Amino acid sequence: MFDKLSIIFNSDRKRKVHLSKAITEISLKLKEQQDRLDEAIRRLRERDKDLFEKVIRSQIEGDIARATIYAQEISDIRKMIKIIYTAYLAIEKVRLKLDTVQELQGVSLVLFPVMRILGELKEQVRGIAPEVALALDSITSSVNSIAIETGALSEKTFVPTVADEQAKQIMEEAQKMAEVKVRELLPELPHPPSELPKRVAKQVQSSNKKSLSEDMILNYIKTTGGFIDVDYIAKNFDVSKDEVFNVLRRLEEKGLIVLEG
């Protein structure tokens, strides 16, 4: 009798060790996909920054049509960044959830929502990061295999409603966090092009000496919706950064602007 109990105990222990190893491998593979997504975000942010500068330059030069094209491309890029950030954050939540798998009895409550989430993420990033989508498909198969091996999934298995609810909640949380993150990382898009850029351009062209007026800065600020890039102003108005800061300080002293950060 004791020999039989010992065999059962050893069998369960081996299954737990195997489960732990398999979960760890999946978590590491998911981390690799997070690294890929992080690199994709970095590249898109660089492109966003380049286009943002082109929008400002085009508006100042009075090329409204070109500025509009650049602004639309920025909008598309930011939609992609949001999708990728959502995937990144959702994967992080999946990894944390996998870490909670300790006992064989609780496997199904973790693996079912994980499979739902990975399947949804695969479809979301397919057109943006196809290599990540392929990897997620493979990882989903691995999770499915674990579910079958542990008995959590079979032909007679009924997927509890709570699994779908957990998956939905995790995705919604990731989307909200991604929206906040994108707003924090990227400057607000310039206001719709107006006649202001043309006036700024005329002021620059009519200035024969390297000087920067308060009106120029105010018009620039109105054009960008409050965003100030000192390096850009210094370069495009052909003045020093100190002169830019001096004008900004004068405007702040007059109560015309408020400098933050």
From Swiss-Prot:
Reported induction: Induced around the genome segregation and cell division stages. Down-regulated after UV irradiation, indicating division inhibition in response to DNA damage. Expression is highest in dividing cells.
Keywords from the UniProt entry: Cell cycle, Cell division, Cytoplasm
Entries under InterPro entries matching the protein: Cell_Div_Complex_Comp, WH-like_DNA-bd_sf, WH_DNA-bd_sf
GO CC terms: cytoplasm; nucleoid
Disulfide bonds: none
Region described as Winged-helix-like fold: 213-261
Keyword set includes Metal-binding: no
BP GO terms, sorted: cell division
Subcellular location: Cytoplasm, Nucleoid
Gene3D superfamilies linked: 6.10.140.1230, Winged helix-like DNA-binding domain superfamily/Winged helix DNA-binding domain
Primary localization class, coarse: cytoplasm
UniProt subunit comment: Interacts with CdvA. Interacts with CdvC.
Domain notes: The winged-helix-like (wH-like) C-terminal extension is necessary and sufficient for interaction with CdvA.
Cited function: Part of a cell division machinery. The CdvA, CdvB and CdvC proteins polymerize between segregating nucleoids and persist throughout cell division, forming a successively smaller structure during constriction.
Protein name: Cell division protein B
Lineage: Archaea, Thermoproteota, Thermoprotei, Sulfolobales, Sulfolobaceae
Gene designation: cdvB
